[in-house]
């Protein structure tokens, strides 16, 4: 069979000639790229597909090139783009051959052809007019077969069109797995025909604390991208405003087909036995007490049958071999007092509540196996006695041993740790580098066989605080591009991967500009939250993207497109509070920082002579408090010594510490202090709170400056990890006037 699609590249196509050296901006980086001679014109093309299995790919390519294509015979001087399979190639491997007048995309399977199309798309520019692509040959394949992204549609709902636009972005960068989180406490989003109440009553909700938080932050920051999307709201039969939505099974099948056309498989997640408050609100008999609960009653045969009935319909909609059952963060307290759960334990010889969850997970595993599906669950299921056909998804970054334990048992693992692959977390240029430096198979202690059990990597985007498509794009991009690079490339030199990516990033941001994607701009650099100066100061921030604009205000208002642009150094002659914002080329705002400039007032050195090197570290029991002031309330475990503000190796639990001692400033000068922590921290100098990074939060860096006279200054740092899940604390001091100078610590 031959299908030929003539495509006229009109206004949707991009207007500049792409030369051979520009092929070097392709992300992910190809394994091999050989430059040819000349160019291939793409004003008019035909797509030649002789394999019926590739017809969806041909349609996808035609849509990518023009957005409008009709089936007809070739003619004139059209460039032929041929799609073909070659079984000698590996899964997802492809070759892209470009010569004058014709382009060949050959894949080891459908996924390989889709990856070749993605590479061709990146060779196309982004404005109307005649286009050419360089003649070349690319031979390419991924390192990891699983290159995924999680989308949470329960906390905030995403329309079919929004999901498809996200799939388009994934396809551009060769991500091939969408993990679709469809059910949670906040909303049931998938039509289950056997239980119509689940969407009839469970798809909409009144505003919850997350919605209110989004609204408050949007008002505070004057950022409409943070507001709850009004298109997802309605007035219910009681006259109340509610939020939500759901997908019909027909819509879901349409999205599945759309994804598969682009080489993407969708793994559905219906989360049991925890995260089930919406299900038990609609069907109270599912819980232990017959009332709304986040946990199902696993002692009830009816509950287990309910789960299987739901999965029957899920499996019928989603053909992918992997189905996610959740299994995380289960509140088991109800099971302790539930007669049915206690009876289940007696009948099955289960000794503990933890064992009861293991029994439930194994029941679902047997069910999935009978259906020809692989069970996937969060890393809490790693020790539930599952077979090697089930997959563990590592998410708890502090639970570092789970990958080794699961792979020793012969289970496959998907790596999506909180440490770098939670895309709902705050981001900066450092988070990009953390993704690029992370290589799951390089986990310490894994044998070669264990390494091969790691399926790949996935970025998780939980949407409690993400309520609009614009904000979703901001949280995901460009981190998703970094994930695509790391999951594809076999280059084991981390620093080379980082440097190469940052060279390519500006070209990728230009592509996102053309697609009207609200990505996060690179960090605003060259400014501190607090800056001291003598005589006069200079404000001169920078951003690593030439098409971005920095604007500022000095009256406390949020900068707009009409605010003054920073095109050079801004002289500061009096105490001033700056608000600086970065703007994309389309005028939309990305990020804001504040910078307070003040005349330096030197802190005198103390008349002390400390004798012992390092800082005294008071290690306390973690009280569960959420402020640094709670640290001292915990019992003292030990007194230790650290050479600087860093956690001593002995501290591997109860991350609740106070550093005390003295800092020696080697010269009069302005010193910049930086405190990076997860969770709360504070830094005091001579009894004055210099940095306040307090409260529960993910990794945040705070900076401040102090003018110090030469000599000793009292220093105190407080730090706690709210969840006691690993401890993240980094602290630095540098002399602004002479960075070569080093401070020392004694007590």
Region locations from a protein language model:
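Short, compositionally stereotyped local motifs that mark structural "simplifiers"
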Residues: 496-618, 623-664, 668-670, 676, ...
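Acidic, contiguous N-terminal accessory segments
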Residues: 11, 20-147, 375-378, 382, ...
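Surface-exposed loop/turn motifs at beta-strand-loop junctions within extracellular Ig-like
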Residues: 109, 582-586, 679, 719-721
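Flexible, acidic glycine-rich loops studded with aromatic residues
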Residues: 375-390, 396-540
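Feature activates predominantly on carbohydrate-active enzymes
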Residues: 89-295, 299-304, 308-322, 363, ...
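Active-site neighborhood of glycoside hydrolase catalytic domains
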Residues: 279-280, 284-389, 396-405
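Short beta-strand-plus-loop segments that form exposed binding edges in beta-rich domains
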Residues: 716-725, 733
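Bacterial N-terminal signal peptides
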Residues: 7-17
């Amino acid at each position: 069979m031959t299908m030929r699609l003539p495509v006229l590249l009109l206004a949707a196509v991009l207007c500049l000639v792409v030369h051979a050296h520009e092929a070097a901006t392709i992300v992910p980086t190809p394994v091999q790229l050989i430059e040819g001679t000349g160019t291939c014109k793409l004003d008019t093309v035909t797509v030649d597909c002789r394999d019926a299995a590739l017809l969806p790919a041909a349609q996808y390519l035609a849509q990518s090139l023009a957005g409008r294509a009709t089936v007809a015979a070739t003619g004139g001087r059209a460039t032929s783009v041929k799609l073909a399979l070659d079984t000698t190639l590996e899964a997802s491997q492809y070759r892209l051959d470009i010569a004058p007048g014709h382009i060949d995309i050959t894949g080891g399977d459908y996924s390989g052809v889709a990856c070749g199309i993605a590479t061709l798309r990146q060779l196309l520019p982004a404005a109307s007019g005649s286009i050419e692509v360089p003649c070349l040959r690319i031979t390419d394949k991924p390192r990891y077969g699983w290159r995924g992204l999680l989308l949470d549609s329960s906390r905030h709902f995403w329309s079919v069109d929004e999901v498809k636009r996200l799939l388009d972005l994934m396809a551009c960068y060769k991500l091939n797995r969408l993990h679709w989180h469809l059910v949670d406490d906040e909303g049931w989003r998938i039509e289950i025909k056997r239980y119509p109440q689940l969407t009839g009553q469970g798809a909409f909700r009144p505003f919850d604390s997350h919605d209110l938080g989004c609204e408050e932050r949007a008002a505070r920051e004057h950022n409409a991208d943070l507001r709850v999307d009004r298109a997802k709201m309605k007035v219910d039969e009681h006259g109340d405003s509610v939020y939500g939505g759901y997908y019909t099974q027909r819509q879901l099948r349409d999205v599945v087909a759309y994804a598969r056309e682009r080489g993407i498989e969708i793994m559905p997640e219906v989360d049991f036995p925890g995260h089930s408050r919406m299900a038990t609100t609609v069907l109270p008999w599912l819980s232990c007490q017959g009332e709304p609960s986040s946990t199902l009653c696993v002692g009830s045969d009816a509950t287990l049958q309910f789960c299987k009935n739901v999965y029957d319909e899920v499996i019928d909609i989603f053909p992918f071999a992997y189905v996610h059952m959740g299994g995380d963060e289960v509140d088991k307290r109800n099971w302790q007092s539930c007669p049915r759960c206690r009876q289940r334990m007696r009948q099955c010889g289960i000794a503990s509540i933890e064992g009861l969850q293991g029994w439930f997970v194994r029941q679902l595993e047997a069910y999935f196996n009978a259906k020809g599906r692989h069970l996937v669950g969060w890393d809490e299921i790693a020790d539930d006695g599952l077979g090697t056909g089930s997959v563990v998804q590592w998410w708890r970054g502090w639970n570092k041993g789970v990958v080794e334990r699961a792979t020793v048992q012969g289970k496959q693992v998907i790596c999506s740790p909180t440490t770098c692959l939670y895309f709902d977390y705050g981001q900066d240029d450092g988070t990009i580098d953390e993704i690029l430096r992370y290589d799951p198979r390089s986990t310490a202690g894994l044998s070669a066989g264990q390494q091969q059990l790691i399926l790949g990597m996935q970025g998780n985007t939980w949407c409690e605080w993400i309520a609009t498509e614009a904000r979703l794009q901001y949280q995901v991009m460009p981190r998703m591009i970094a994930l695509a690079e790391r999951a594809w490339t076999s280059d084991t030199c981390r620093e080379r991967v980082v440097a190469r990516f940052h060279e390519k990033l500006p070209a990728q941001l230009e592509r996102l500009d053309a697609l009207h994607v609200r990505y996060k701009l690179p960090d605003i650099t060259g400014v501190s939250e607090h800056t001291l100066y003598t005589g006069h100061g200079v404000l001169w921030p920078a951003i690593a993207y030439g098409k971005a604009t920095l604007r500022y205000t000095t009256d406390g208002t949020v900068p707009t497109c009409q605010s003054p642009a920073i095109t050079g150094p801004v002289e500061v002659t009096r105490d001033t509070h700056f608000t600086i914002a970065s703007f994309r080329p389309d005028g939309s705002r990305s990020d804001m920082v504040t910078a307070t400039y003040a005349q330096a007032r030197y802190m005198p050195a103390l008349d002390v002579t400390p004798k012992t090197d390092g800082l005294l570290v008071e290690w306390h029991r973690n009280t569960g408090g959420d402020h640094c002031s709670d640290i001292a309330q915990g019992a003292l475990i030990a007194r230790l010594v650290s050479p600087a503000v860093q956690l001593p190796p002995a501290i591997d639990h109860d991350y609740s510490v106070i550093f005390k001692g003295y800092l020696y400033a080697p010269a009069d000068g302005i010193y910049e202090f930086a405190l990076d922590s997860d969770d709360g921290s504070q830094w005091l100098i001579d009894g004055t709170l210099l940095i306040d990074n307090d409260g529960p939060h993910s990794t945040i860096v705070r900076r401040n400056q102090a003018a110090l006279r030469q000599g000793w200054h009292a220093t105190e740092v407080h730090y706690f990890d709210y969840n006691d899940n690993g401890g993240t604390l980094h602290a630095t001091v540098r002399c602004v006037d002479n960075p070569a100078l080093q401070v020392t610590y004694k007590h």
